[in-house]
């Protein structure tokens, strides 16, 4: 199942599907953020029982990973199978330890840096 982690990604996913003229199953999610502190306080997955299906969260950037960890925890409550993360830009400013608790694998490009970590699989950008 393809997972869109927040309202911004939901819009991008819908636009992509419109441009392709297809709709691939999409699980939409949302979160609440305190705009003055930046603290995330609530995550919601708009799906029922996922019956052990694998889930791939897709977004543009992962810095600290709090959004993705919160969404992964909610997906687990909905009986998701293995959970994967794909981001174009992987910064991982807090490391990957917390991500290893929630994701089977994380995929990203080397647009930010080359990363040596068993959890991370990078795709090299060739210019």
State what each model feature region is:
Residues 1-127:
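PRPP-associated nucleotide enzymes
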């Amino acid at each position: 199942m393809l997972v869109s982690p927040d309202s911004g990604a939901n819009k991008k996913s819908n636009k992509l599907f419109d441009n392709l003229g297809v709709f691939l199953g999409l699980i939409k999610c949302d979160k609440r953020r305190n705009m003055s502190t930046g603290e995330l306080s609530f995550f919601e997955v708009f799906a029922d029982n996922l019956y052990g299906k694998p889930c791939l969260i897709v977004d543009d950037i992962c810095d600290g990973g709090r959004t993705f960890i919160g969404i992964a925890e909610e997906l687990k409550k909905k009986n998701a199978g293995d959970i994967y993360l794909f981001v174009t830009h992987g910064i991982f400013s807090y490391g990957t330890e917390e991500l290893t608790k929630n994701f089977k694998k994380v995929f990203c490009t080397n647009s930010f840096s080359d990363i040596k970590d068993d959890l991370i699989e990078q795709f090299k950008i060739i210019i």
